[in-house]
């Protein structure tokens, strides 16, 4: 195993395939150590039970973490009918059980249709959402329940992949803030059979549909040069934003906090990808009236 002994400037995005049984923060810290990065952050946690894509931002890439937090996600999940748990997944205590239930393939398909599109979801008490600074899951473990407001979510894909009468496998594409285990539980409630999630794998975060993920074991076995080659350029996380190329003098000006005049036809308030003349990523700008651009989040080096 090759590691970087002293922390250095590492900038880029790593698509980690998080292992089961590890918290997202623990996975982040292990990867940060492997790369010897000074600064690192993840873009939306996965429960310890879950596996799959966890984008990690190193160095200057941490400045665009929010765009990945806001991105749509796609998952594969398995639910089991016949019982509910206090956590809505297989790590919790069973709080409801029914033995004599019958759910047909057609009934399940019809139920899934009800959850497609725009809908509302009440987050679980066993979530990382905070109440007065305290994560809800900590309150839940103390037997405290806080009223939670239903949140707007969008489920763009909800496809039944397999069903054996008890366990069902789904592919789910959804907006940020969607709790898949709560979706599985809600489906079970609608079917009047109860359900809890037994498996969750994040297939991808929007923008990285075709990119490879790496496990911690794979990274540990790589020579340093190969490990660094796994990093993705920062601007790939914001490819959905309109690109704008600035001249060298404009790059200097915007880094000094000046507004660049008459440079874009984008709508006022729209975020933009900014590049220098040599296609180096400068950072994120924001469109103003009359086509002007101001800096919003600039990286401090030329890629």
From Swiss-Prot:
Which CDD domains does the entry link to? PseudoU_synth_EcTruB, PUA_TruB_bacterial
One Pfam family here: TruB-C_2
Q: Which reaction(s) does the protein catalyse, per the Swiss-Prot or TrEMBL entry?
A: uridine(55) in tRNA = pseudouridine(55) in tRNA
Q: Which organism is it from?
A: Legionella pneumophila (strain Lens)
Highest lineage ranks of the organism? Bacteria, Pseudomonadati, Pseudomonadota, Gammaproteobacteria, Legionellales
Zinc-finger recorded as keyword? no
One function term, GO molecular function aspect? tRNA pseudouridine(55) synthase activity
- The main enzyme category here is isomerase
Listed InterPro entries: PsdUridine_synth_cat_dom_sf (IPR020103), PsdUridine_synth_N (IPR002501), PUA-like_sf (IPR015947), PUA_sf (IPR036974), tRNA_psdUridine_synth_TruB (IPR014780), tRNA_sdUridine_synth_fam1_C (IPR015240), TruB_C (IPR032819)
Q: What does this protein do?
A: Responsible for synthesis of pseudouridine from uracil-55 in the psi GC loop of transfer RNAs.
| UniProt record, GO biological process | mRNA pseudouridine synthesis; tRNA pseudouridine synthesis
What keywords does the record list, in alphabetical order?
Isomerase, tRNA processing
**Superkingdom classification of source:** Bacteria
Family label? Belongs to the pseudouridine synthase TruB family. Type 1 subfamily.
The record, for Gene3D superfamilies, names: Pseudouridine synthase, PUA domain
The protein's name:
tRNA pseudouridine synthase B
| EC number assigned by the record | 5.4.99.25
């Amino acid at each position: 195993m090759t590691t970087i002994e002293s922390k250095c400037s590492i900038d880029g995005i790593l698509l980690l395939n998080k292992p089961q049984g590890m918290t997202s923060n623990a996975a982040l810290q292990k990867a940060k150590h492997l790369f010897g990065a000074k600064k690192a952050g993840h873009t939306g946690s996965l429960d310890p039970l879950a596996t799959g894509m966890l984008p990690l931002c190193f160095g200057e890439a941490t400045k665009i973490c929010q765009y990945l937090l806001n991105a749509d996600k796609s998952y594969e999940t398995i639910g089991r009918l016949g019982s509910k748990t206090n956590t809505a997944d297989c790590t919790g205590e069973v709080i409801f059980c029914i033995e004599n239930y019958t759910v047909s393939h057609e009934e399940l398909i019809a139920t899934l249709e009800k959850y497609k599109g725009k809908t509302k979801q009440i987050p679980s008490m066993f979530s990382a959402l905070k109440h007065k600074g305290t994560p809800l899951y900590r309150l839940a473990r103390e037997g405290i329940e806080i009223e939670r407001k239903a949140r707007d979510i969008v489920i763009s894909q909800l496809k039944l992949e397999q069903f054996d009468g008890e366990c069902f496998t789904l592919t789910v594409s959804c907006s940020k803030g969607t709790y898949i285990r709560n979706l599985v539980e809600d489906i079970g409630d609608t079917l009047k059979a109860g359900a809890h999630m037994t498996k969750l794998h994040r297939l991808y975060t929007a923008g990285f549909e075709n990119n490879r993920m790496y496990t911690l074991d794979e990274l540990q076995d790589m020579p340093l040069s190969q490990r660094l080659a796994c990093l993705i350029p920062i601007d790939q996380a914001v490819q959905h934003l309109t690109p704008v190329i600035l001249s060298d003098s404009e790059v200097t000006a915007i880094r000094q906090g000046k507004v660049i005049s008459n440079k874009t036809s984008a709508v006022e308030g729209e975020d933009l990808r900014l590049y220098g003349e040599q296609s180096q990523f400068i950072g994120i700008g924001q469109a103003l009236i009359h086509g002007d651009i101001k800096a919003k989040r600039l990286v401090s080096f030329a890629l």
